[in-house]
Amino acid sequence: MGLPGAGKSSVALVLARAWDCGVVDTDDEVAQRAGVGVAELLRSHGESALRKLELDVVSDLKHRDVVVATGGGVVATLGARELLKELPTVWLDCDDEVLVARLGDEERPLLGDDWPASIKRLRVERTPWYEEVARARVDASGTVDEVAVRVAAAIDVVDT
């Protein structure tokens, strides 16, 4: 888990390949269940509809042997936080400047037009939740492979 641009989806793919298991991106799963992309779901039904579907997805994935890349805001729902606490959840964290640079031209409806200000606001809002849920906090700056190695090491330490 982590803020937009932290590398959640990319790192999850690398870890799933390394561990020879499946990978599920909750944003993709939410879009599949909703029948529309996350951006359209937000525009047409609001954030509460997104959070409800995220909670359902996390609940359904709890007992599957897969690497899960969560949406950055999954922690906004108490039920999802409670579920994530039961899993080896890792917080991918890096400087705001890195996050903004990584986002490029992607469509991010929750960020609005001023991405640096939105990232700063989301960090203030979500950091307490990330701290509550995460078993480990990993530096997400660097390449995807470097971050994946850090995550694997953090999970190994947490699980022993």
Question: Where are the regions that the model predicts?
Answer:
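Conserved glycine(s) of the Walker
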Residues: 7
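A glycine- and Lys/Arg-enriched "phosphate-lid" helix/loop adjacent to the NTP-binding pocket
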Residues: 86-128, 152
